[in-house]
């Protein structure tokens, strides 16, 4: 029996199972390998000699080193390899052709390769070439195709594209970077109007006749990335976007002199980086606007998720007569910079009535004279609390890159103070997340944790609400990306909750390299209804009515607890000062200092409690004796 099994195993071990597979399946398997690696299989046998070439997707990159016997780079080897693969394929159908080559490649060869795949009906063409074309113009047959669905062209030397006869009726994705559109009138308009089903458009570093009068009109476009950052930063004369079905919009440009026909009816996400020119920055002042981007903001005012760069925050201050109301905005992302002020943020936050999530990418900003005004900045002011914070509807606050110090003007203490200020003044805040680098010192995080405890306690006192504090651990994350909040899960909650979560963004992959950090988190929960006593939720169910009755019964208790807590605030200050002194004198970390202080206080108070108990017992005995004598 064992001998038979060994014979069967021996027969299977000698048999070439892969070679017996259908050739179509073998070609499909080889298509998952780089073509340079799959070409090595041609030496296995005669059957494998040409199989590597029959693959629907061809990707060539001359970054793979092609060396001659002397060890020097030889571009001819790369050119011969591409020619051989294409000749072996013959008229074999091709789906994707990707070519990445530098300025050593012969433009005649590149033109021949492009013509070959275009004649065979390629649907996905990806060209990233630095080639010195004849007359500087790319082959015109690229832009005349019924089969092309995805087209990407990226040059490093600004090659010309002749769009006189462009015809791409089935193109859905277009990516252009560092190209010059050549046309008798307006090359960009001609190109877009010739793409009848275009859905995804990426434009960067391109130029055409009429470049300063930018106009884009497309009823089918859904995603648009538009980079027009000039080296000399010139203000465009006019900008027009007629894209009613656009849902994703990334736009980098200088402030235009005029905005017209801004149609973004379906916009969901927008990332805006508008900037002023050097001339505008020189003459910008609070009394004199140097531009007007109001019409552009009105066009995107129905967006749901908005990301604003620091330059855009400055544009809102110096180039905007009025900030419109963003009635549908639920998530706002602010990218900060130490050279840009926050003067426009108070008005912007006021004009976001349904804002749920606020995200700061860093806490950097330029200190200006407006920082001392109540509604001139988000900084803590001695004149009062900004109304944009005291009446803010924000429920989720996230701060990326907390503690990042860019220059000598950045201060860790200011960032901690700003976090505490947000927590104290934003009444509807339910959750705060801080993402910080593991290089931040442990004592800084420990101090922040203690301040969070105290700030949360004071906030509960000021609001005169009964809380039940509890501790949770730091959320350890191996990535630096923040997940998108699930807004819907919070809209139907009847209970009031507030939590702060400190999260480390790890910069290294191995968890064993992470420094130990004391886990801490604070979450508070109020098991009471937030509805009004009368006139609210009249159509609510029995549970809502019961919650309202619970509020009525517990109202007096809440006030008593709040008053008692206010009386104990001095004791909290005293205990916190003791912990700080122990930490400074002994050198222990914060948690060890808290434990040591606890034992110290217990050691002092227990004898006093025993003595008080003895005195109370003696007093009771004396009273009993006096009662017996009477």
UniProtKB/Swiss-Prot annotation:
InterPro entries: F-box-like_dom_sf, F-box_AtFBL13-like, F-box_dom, FBD, FBL60-like, LRR_dom_sf, LRR_FXL15/At3g58940/PEG3-like. SUPFAM superfamilies: F-box domain, L domain-like. It comes from the Eukaryota. SMART domains: FBD. The keyword Oxidoreductase does not apply. Pfam families: F-box (PF00646), LRR_At5g56370 (PF24758). CDD domains: F-box_AtFBL13-like. Keywords: Leucine-rich repeat, Repeat. LRR repeats lie at residues 101-129, 152-178, 180-205, 228-253, 300-325, 337-362, 406-436, 437-465, 567-590. Residues 15-63 form the F-box domain. This is Putative F-box/LRR-repeat protein At3g49150. It comes from Arabidopsis thaliana (Mouse-ear cress).
